[in-house]
Amino acid sequence: MSNVQTGAERMPHDLSHLGFLAGQIGRLITISTTPVIAGDSFEMDAVGALRLSPLRRGLAIDSTVDIFTFYVPHRHVYGERWIKFMKDGVNATPLPTVNTTSYIDHAAFLGTINPDTNKIPKHLFQGYLNIYNNYFKAPWMPDRTEANPNELNEDDARYGFRCCHLKNIWTAPLPPETELSRRMTTSTTSIDIMGLQAAYANLHTDQERDYFMQRYRDVISSFGGKTSYDADNRPLLVMRSNFWASGYDVDGTDQTSLGQFSGRVQQTYKHSVPRFFVPEHGTMFTLALVRFPPTATKEIQYLNAKGALTYTDIAGDPALYGNLPPREISMKDVFRSGDSSKKFKIAEGQWYRYAPSYVSPVYHLLEGFPFIQEPPSGDLQERVLIRHHDYDHCFQSVQLLQWNSQVKFNVTVYRNLPTTRDSIMTS
């Protein structure tokens, strides 16, 4: 009778580990990855402290921190190749890799040290791309489709991809292809009332898809249905934690002059993932994103910047605001010294749905506060995405980048795996 071991009892495995992390404002960085096997049950309690690098001045604005855990099946990355790989077993062709550069930190955005081979598994890189494309870019932005990490610029490879500002009138515009008008042609001088209604219906369904249903799952939900994350190879968001990182001012930071002070930010946090059943092999990604609210020194309330106001501008007439097409405005309409050639589109009356922050002019010549000093420039995508260099002047030192965190990931995975003793004592 054969004594070859062909199975194993389902047992808890302690995969707890530490993370010593550093990142930049507005960039999505991976802070932990755990490979998982079909049939696993994964649970995690992450406990840590997040710090901003020492500020040059007193703490002016709290930063908001988001921590996410996603599940990405390998099948979403490798497709039919993964299915064949599992069917072929030990005779299967090895899975492909992707190429990195030779720098040690050019895979840091994936939460790993770059190996000497300058190659990493494809599912790490493509899994990150899938997460970013589905959850962190504006739907109207093109997908990131780089085939290898060595195609990324240095900032993306080291610190992660740029994410959008928190929403306001100029950081969350309508899609650039938004129509400001639509004409209906008729063949005669008379108007077909039924045809007019049909044209309205076509316009409505087009607008719904342009604004609210750019992804398949959104279209299906509009019919009252629901798609699984498998339907469009979407990473599954398992848990999100959000908190504000607060701090305090420290007086007497200089030995010779106790009048100096510096802002310090240290916020403890907990990110808990309840037990999650893993249906097939994949990777659990945990990512972090730290952002300041977009507070600009030269931002102006739209009505204050426009000058002579029309009835439509100021009346707030529901009949008009509910039926007028979107309005195209420029950066000059919401910023002093804004570029009038940089256009974007907003819903009519959006200035009554949002209030800009105000920064006294006495701050304008001072560096060290987390304010956006100049109106964002570049194309629409460039203006919407956060530029971490805008905040470099806030910090005394960026040796540990703009924020850092020390965290204990308490991870337990229940899986069918032979014990270490069983693996040693072969046959």
UniProtKB/Swiss-Prot annotation:
<keyword id="KW-1171">Viral genome ejection through host cell envelope</keyword>
<dbReference type="InterPro" id="IPR016184">
    <property type="entry name" value="Capsid/spike_ssDNA_virus"/>
</dbReference>
<keyword id="KW-0167">Capsid protein</keyword>
<dbReference type="GO" id="GO:0039615">
    <property type="term" value="C:T=1 icosahedral viral capsid"/>
</dbReference>
<dbReference type="GO" id="GO:0046718">
    <property type="term" value="P:symbiont entry into host cell"/>
</dbReference>
<dbReference type="Pfam" id="PF02305">
    <property type="entry name" value="Phage_F"/>
</dbReference>
<protein>
    <recommendedName>
        <fullName>Capsid protein F</fullName>
    </recommendedName>
</protein>
<dbReference type="GO" id="GO:0005198">
    <property type="term" value="F:structural molecule activity"/>
</dbReference>
<keyword id="KW-1140">T=1 icosahedral capsid protein</keyword>
<comment type="subunit">
    <text>Pentamerizes and interacts with H protein, G and B pentamers to form 12S pre-assembly complex. By binding with protein D, induces joining of twelve 12S complex to form the procapsid. The procapsid has an external scaffold made of 240 copies of protein D, 60 copies of the internally located B protein, and contains 60 copies of each of the viral structural proteins F and G. Upon genome packaging, interacts with protein J. The mature virion is composed of 60 copies each of the F, G, and J proteins, and 12 copies of the H protein.</text>
</comment>
<dbReference type="InterPro" id="IPR037002">
    <property type="entry name" value="Microviridae_protein_F_sf"/>
</dbReference>
<comment type="function">
    <text>Assembles to form an icosahedral capsid with a T=1 symmetry, about 30 nm in diameter, and consisting of 60 capsid proteins F. Upon virus binding to host cell, one of the spikes dissociates from the capsid and the virus interacts with LPS through the exposed EF loops on the F proteins. After the genome had been ejected, the channel formed by the F proteins at the unique fivefold axis remains open.</text>
</comment>
<dbReference type="InterPro" id="IPR003514">
    <property type="entry name" value="Microviridae_protein_F"/>
</dbReference>
<keyword id="KW-1160">Virus entry into host cell</keyword>
<keyword id="KW-1162">Viral penetration into host cytoplasm</keyword>
<keyword id="KW-0946">Virion</keyword>
<comment type="similarity">
    <text>Belongs to the microviridae F protein family.</text>
</comment>
